[in-house]
Amino acid sequence: MDKETGKAARSASGRKITESVEFVAEGKDGTAEVEFVFDGSNLAGKTLVAFEKLYYGDKLYAVHTDLEDEDQTIHVPAAGTTASDKNTGTHHAYAGEYVELTDTIEYRNLLPGETYTLHGTVVEKETEQRLSEEKQQEFIPEKADGSIEIAFEINGTDLSGKTAVIYEEIKIDGKSIAEHKNPEAKEQSIYFPKIGTKAMDKKSKTQEGDAREKQTIIDQVSYENLLPGETYILKGVLMDKADGKEMTDKNNRKITGRTTFTPEKSAGTVEMTFELDARELGGKAVVVFENLYDEEDHLIADEANIDNADQTIIYKNNEKSAVSPKINTDNPKPSSSIRKSPKTGVENHTFLWMLTLGSLGTAVAAGIAIYRKKRD
């Protein structure tokens, strides 16, 4: 019987749980065993009470149908888990070398004062390969219902784009009485997002741009293993490949981009735009770095490889687009100590005409002097 409802309990197949046994009494007092075998996977957390009736032939001789009799009662424990990343406090985690996870196990229908052992393991969802050693933790519940936490440390370096699931099992005297091992359960899962980028110059539609004043970089950011309906923040910054430092504009501000989005599916793309003055970038390479954050601004994925060609825009040399140098107007007159170089063009022609006229004048003067001498 289901103690909560007072009705006959039913197995996972939907059938009432009944059993009967015939026996021959060897004396006026004795015992007989009745064994119930059924699929009870649907009864986690339930309290079952065995009702017994004794017949001799078709005649009812005795009954024992007390819902409050503890000796007839079976407590079916239940366990549910909620996994979270210690850093984010959510089901998202950054795929770093050291990842701390916390699993909160909520149990029901345990026996207060008894000693139980909690067994937990972290596995990779697709392969169910272990990501941690099995952890064991003893506890003695004060009440039938309650919760207990267990912590795990794993290496998440290779988990970008993958999902980790925490499996839990409660045992008493070495026997399993409750477990939660569903690889599809979101509550048990930790999601490690993954992003990739493909940058291009807006005008050329390639990864090569012109070193001109107003230039635009469009970055197509692909994502994997996000939770549909959740809110995410994408932040980007432009990097100078030569020195690996963040680029700044004329006001010494970083050249950044930012967008917020809510994916409809776990995988997809989102676009980021960057505006910059590229006049001084001829022959240089610009690399786009992207960081993905959850709604609470926790970093959960990034793409920050300075040598990634897909993230790189190269600007061609363009002499016409070079920034004009500043002219110093404070001292327009040249110093007298500086020797002037001969000029070319029209001014040079004037110099030649003056030289020619000077020569002719000298010749005429000399001729007049000779003529006067002869007359004398």
Model-derived segments and spans:
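C-terminal low-complexity, Ser/Thr- and acidic/Pro-rich disordered "stalk" regions positioned immediately N-terminal
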Residues: 316-347
